[in-house]
Amino acid sequence: TQGNTCGGETCSAAQVCLKGKCVCNEVHCRIRCKYGLKKDENGCEYPCSCAKASQ
């Protein structure tokens, strides 16, 4: 979930805590998105969430 503290930083909802560091979540789903998957400020993809045209 968003806001998890991990080794002194806060992970986004698209990240998981691994060995004290926020890393991109490796969960993927089989959906097609016109504009690709939604990404956080670190470039990590949110699982099964489509991006909007403006991203």
Swiss-Prot record:
Residues 24-50 form the Antistasin-like domain. One of its GO terms (biological process) is negative regulation of coagulation. Gene3D superfamilies: Antistasin, domain 1 (2.10.22.10). InterPro entries: Antistasin-like, Hirudin/antistatin, Prot_inh_I15_antistasin_leech. GO terms for molecular function: heparin binding; serine-type endopeptidase inhibitor activity. The record marks 30-31 as: Reactive bond. One of its GO terms (cellular component) is extracellular region. It holds the Pfam family Antistasin. It is found in: Secreted. It comes from the Eukaryota. Keywords: Disulfide bond, Heparin-binding, Protease inhibitor, Secreted, Serine protease inhibitor. Coiled coil: none annotated. Disulfide bonds join 6-17, 11-22, 24-44, 29-48, 33-50. Belongs to the protease inhibitor I15 (antistasin) family. Acts as an inhibitor of tissue kallikrein, trypsin, chymotrypsin and neutrophil cathepsin G. This is Hirustasin. It comes from Hirudo medicinalis.
